[in-house]
Amino acid sequence: MNHPAFAAHSTLEAPAWVKHKKLIEWVQRVAALAKPERIVWCDGSQEEYDRLTAQMVAAGTLRRLNPAKRPNSYLACSDPSDVARVEDRTFICSQRREDAGPTNNWIAPAEMRATLDGLFDGAMRGRTMYVVPFSMGPLGSPIAHIGVELSDSPYVVSNMRIMTRMGRKVYDVLGEDGEFVPCVHSVGAPLAAGQKDVAWPCNDTKYIVHFPESREIWSYGSGYGGNALLGKKCFALRIASTMGRAEGWLAEHMLVLGVTSPEGKKHHVAAAFPSACGKTNFAMLIPPQGMNGWKITTIGDDIAWIKPGKDGRLYAINPEAGYFGVAPGTSEKTNFNAMATLKENVIFTNVALTDDGDVWWEGMTDEPPAHLIDWQGRDWTPAIAKETGRKAAHPNARFTAPASQCPSIDADWENPAGVPIDAFVFGGRRSTTVPLVTEARDWVEGVYMAATMGSETTAAAAGQQGVVRRDPFAMLPFCGYNMSDYFAHWLKTGVKLEQMSVRTPKIFCVNWFRKGDDGKFVWPGFGENMRVLRWMVDRIEGKAKGEEHAFGVSPRYDDLDWSGLDFTREQFEQVISVDDAAWRKELALHSELFDTLKQGLPVALQDTRSALEKKLTA
């Protein structure tokens, strides 16, 4: 268990470059509770990363991929019980239950702290506790915030180095008394003296806990990304959303992209889609044939922090430094830029291994390889798949890759001031009812659209698949406070923008997933979504027309640019039509959502629903 390579920083004593007394005392308190064998103060260097990955290869946690095929890249395969976020074990422990709201799990803070004290007592015995300093957002940005994660998982440390700005430079920004979000993580698998470790330690008991008032995160029992990489959903959305409410900004489950016209005019769009609904594909979109001169650039693919600038407009950063993307379905056809990003320096999790030491997943190629080792270490062939239905890669298999490797990365992706947002887009996976694109007539109507959006569940959350659930703003699993208060915060943001007399971002709702009578998707999606994006940009510029209906404004067939695509008026009608009977049922479902959220639900949203109902029956 001895790691002499870490001797320089393997101590309860902090290195000289850590000058933050409260941070040091906190590390000492957690160490006294969790009782690790050693403490390593991470510096974020390449040497440290190389040591950790070599250590994990030796332990069987990682497999080094063929350097000729996939340089400096690794494959991790998790325990089969630890493959996704665990929403039923995720808690918002606010002082008052009503502050967590009906969509979050709540336990009284004192009770939860007693539970965690018991779980973490000796939880890191026999293991190393890593002190991982990280910045969410460019170092020193006025939109960025700092966190420090204490974890007994080298897998977490390695992923955090890719996903955040991690290392010694964070302490320079933090100084002696800067604010940071304290994050504590353990896989919950202490080792007795002489006990052999397993390749993927975890515990059947899992807790992912947030204390909004003290801005703390505690995670126990899981080594999986969303549960263990605490800078991601836990900090960047759940805790940050509560910070944003208190401080007047937004932390959102959104991609951010730049769209530049052939004339060189650039706009920025932030878009929210539930997990595995095409967020990364949209963020890295390549304009299709016939739309020459248009260019899409990527600022972020998953999370946006949005703060008012000095001019009153909303400015966004991507708080992450990497992509933690869903692998299955990603291919050179569906997302060329993502595949190019994955050529080197990647950690893959729960994908399949090819016989020549590379990776594969469902959807990567038209034909699967003749033989693979699946994500659970078993032989896999197309014949086995046909007979058993077994997937080679887990449906929620992931890649962790540096954002800097993306060919479509925006020149401003690390601009500390952020980029100005011209439009918000919201979308879910709906096979019926919701049109291809609708523009809200005003901010309140846009907030209503986002508040009532629905999507089918995905493999990113453990549980049932294929069921439509309401997912307001794509934030249902990620909002760190009462959802009704969250809606009110969005409405208040709109009022502030109006008071500042700045151009308010337009709000659009999209649905790429309408199906025809044959059960197939009608809209081709992927790069063709550029045609919808162009209409949005032209609406911002006042150049494009549309047709008003009960729910807003949608394009007519001739309002879209069809150059290079054979898509008939009949097909367009299938994806754009508004069925009044279906929408009356939809509004009834909106009422069910509002009944769930009735405590504190803004009157403006109830009034909007009533107005829509009247329009439908007029």
Curated annotation (Swiss-Prot):
Its cofactor is Mn(2+). GTP binds at A276, C277, G278, K279, T280, N281, R398, R429, F526, G527, E528, N529. It catalyses: oxaloacetate + GTP = phosphoenolpyruvate + GDP + CO2. Binds 1 Mn(2+) ion per subunit. It is an enzyme of class 4 (lyase). Its EC number is 4.1.1.32. Its main location: cytoplasm. One of its GO terms (molecular function) is phosphoenolpyruvate carboxykinase (GTP) activity. Substrate binds at R85, Y224, G225, G226, S275, N396, A397, R398. Mn(2+) binds at K233, H253, D302. InterPro entries: PEP_carboxykin_GTP_CS, PEP_carboxykinase_C, PEP_carboxykinase_GTP, PEP_carboxykinase_GTP_C, PEP_carboxykinase_GTP_N, PEP_carboxykinase_N. Keywords: Cytoplasm, Decarboxylase, Gluconeogenesis, GTP-binding, Lyase, Manganese, Metal-binding, Nucleotide-binding. Pathway: Carbohydrate biosynthesis; gluconeogenesis. CDD domains: PEPCK_GTP (cd00819). It is found in: Cytoplasm. One of its GO terms (biological process) is response to lipid. Belongs to the phosphoenolpyruvate carboxykinase [GTP] family. Monomer. Catalyzes the conversion of oxaloacetate (OAA) to phosphoenolpyruvate (PEP), the rate-limiting step in the metabolic pathway that produces glucose from lactate and other precursors derived from the citric acid cycle. This is Phosphoenolpyruvate carboxykinase [GTP]. It comes from Paraburkholderia phymatum (strain DSM 17167 / CIP 108236 / LMG 21445 / STM815) (Burkholderia phymatum).
